[in-house]
């Protein structure tokens, strides 16, 4: 049986595209044996690894509201001394509602979550291949604790932030688990993003911080994808890369979840059809 490891990028609400992409993958008969997720992609990965159907996952995601993910922190009034713009409590409660599992041991499919240790700068893994004794909601908060927006997660005396700080698309992590195929869905910051449409009001300081993070994340992703593209033809593991269209400044556009999912399905179906055509060539 072909071992498929799904690498799901960060990207906020845009990660709804992962649901559509995984649906297209399953329609080909390939079944994910392992999910590796970064940032909000880690939450989507956890929902699927817990055994939720794609329909249930879509419903859970559609029920999210902005106040669940971005509840303003009173401490933001402290200016320079604030730990983050948003309160972690509402976010953690939203994650607990989304993911019907409390421990990694409760999951039906292997799951690996990435975060970054703020002291060492190293990528930290939770779940398969890393620490699996941490409550799932703690690991998921760590994976999503994007600097400026949320305070770092504190786990056993260590502080962790969003895994996207090191690798918004966890391709290299997925490759650690001896897959035959890495099915990677990328909706994170990149140079291919369409410009913001101007409908989202973003405070200047937040926009500047987001632009810097986008540059750093996009540069790392470009370097990593370049390394993978430079591999010999037919190198193992096979990479199936799905990159749905994305637009800047839509991280919190929960009203577009349905459109993102449709984009993920359409793009993945096309990529998979092209893969099938290549494999059928003499």
Predicted features and spans:
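ATP/pyrophosphate-binding catalytic subdomain of soluble kinases
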Residues: 135-173
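Short glycine/serine/threonine-rich phosphate/pyrophosphate-binding segments
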Residues: 15-18, 42, 167-171
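A short alpha-helix-loop-beta-strand transition element characteristic
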Residues: 99-112
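Catalytic nucleophile loop
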Residues: 9, 32-50
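Conserved small-residue
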Residues: 11, 21, 41, 113, ...
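Helix-rich "cap/lid" substructures immediately adjacent to catalytic or cofactor-binding pockets
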Residues: 1-35
């Amino acid at each position: 049986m072909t071992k498929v490891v799904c690498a799901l990028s960060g990207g906020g609400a845009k990660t709804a595209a992962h649901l559509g992409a995984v649906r297209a993958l399953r329609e080909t008969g390939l079944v994910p044996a392992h999910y590796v997720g970064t940032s909000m992609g880690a939450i989507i990965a956890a929902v699927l690894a817990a055994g939720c159907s794609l329909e249930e996952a879509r419903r859970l995601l559609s029920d999210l509201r902005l106040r669940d993910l971005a509840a303003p922190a009173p401490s933001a009034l402290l200016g320079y001394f604030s730990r983050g713009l948003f309160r972690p409590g509402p976010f953690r409660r939203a994650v607990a509602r989304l993911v019907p599992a409390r421990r990694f041991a409760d999951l039906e499919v292997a799951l690996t979550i990435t975060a970054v240790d703020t002291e060492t700068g190293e990528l930290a893994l939770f779940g398969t291949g890393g620490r699996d004794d941490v409550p799932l909601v703690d690991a998921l908060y760590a994976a999503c604790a994007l600097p400026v927006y949320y305070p770092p997660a504190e786990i056993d005396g260590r502080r962790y932030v969003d895994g996207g700080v090191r690798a918004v698309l966890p391709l290299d992590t997925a490759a650690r688990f001896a897959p035959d195929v890495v099915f990677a869905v990328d909706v994170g910051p990149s140079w291919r993003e369409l410009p913001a449409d101007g409908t989202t009001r973003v405070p200047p300081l937040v926009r500047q911080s987001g632009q810097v993070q986008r540059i750093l994340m996009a540069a790392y992703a470009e370097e990593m994808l370049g390394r993978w593209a430079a591999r010999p033809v037919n190198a193992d593991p096979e990479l199936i890369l799905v990159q749905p269209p994305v637009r800047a400044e839509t991280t919190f556009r929960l009203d577009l979840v349905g459109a993102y999912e449709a984009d993920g399905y359409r793009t993945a179906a096309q990529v998979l059809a092209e893969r099938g055509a290549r494999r059928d060539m003499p």
